[in-house]
């Protein structure tokens, strides 16, 4: 458990812009992580490979903890007068679980064209985003500016922990997608 007591108002590079960029990720990650879990779990029953089934369970567990820890960081934002819940609710309704959200509209539309196409597309989106996240995670460890001197230690600890787990499970969604539908077009359609 990372302590988020006394997080500096401009805890990234001493910059309001850089800090708010990172803060926005703390707001986006909880619903995004839940979307990733939903998109992978939809196909867990179709997976035959026992090792991959274990990897899926581990992935879902890690993503759930990521969501919780980033949402826990919101307390530091509240203390600074920020209101992360407003944007999180907006994001949830428009992108994820609202009746006319991107997730529901695209899934329903694509499933009309071909059974499970919407679910496969969501899995493809998850695969692409997990790939990008792993690239950013890897860069975080090699970026000279990503030090306690430039980033509040609490923020850096949370980001390093999350980054290490992203690197650890970076191939799980790709492996699930390849087992569910090995279509190259599906894989690259969202890249």
Residue ranges and their predicted role:
Residues 1-191:
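Non-heme di-metal
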């Amino acid at each position: 458990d990372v302590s988020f007591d006394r997080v500096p108002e401009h805890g990234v590079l001493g910059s309001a812009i850089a800090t708010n960029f990172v803060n926005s990720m703390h707001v986006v990650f909880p619903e995004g992580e839940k979307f990733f879990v939903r998109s992978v779990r939809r196909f867990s029953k179709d997976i035959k490979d026992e090792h991959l089934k274990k990897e899926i369970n581990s992935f879902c567990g890690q993503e759930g903890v990521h969501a919780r820890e980033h949402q826990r960081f919101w307390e530091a934002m509240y203390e600074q007068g920020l209101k992360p819940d407003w944007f999180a609710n907006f994001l949830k309704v428009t992108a994820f679980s609202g009746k006319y959200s991107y997730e529901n509209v695209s899934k329903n539309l694509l499933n009309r064209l071909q059974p499970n196409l919407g679910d496969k597309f969501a899995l493809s989106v998850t695969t692409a985003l997990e790939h990008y996240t792993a690239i950013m995670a890897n860069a975080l460890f090699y970026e000279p500016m990503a030090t306690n001197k430039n980033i509040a230690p609490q923020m850096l600890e949370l980001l390093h922990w999350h980054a290490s787990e992203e690197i650890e499970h970076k191939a799980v969604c790709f492996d699930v997608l390849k087992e569910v539908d090995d279509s190259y077009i599906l894989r690259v359609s969202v890249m």
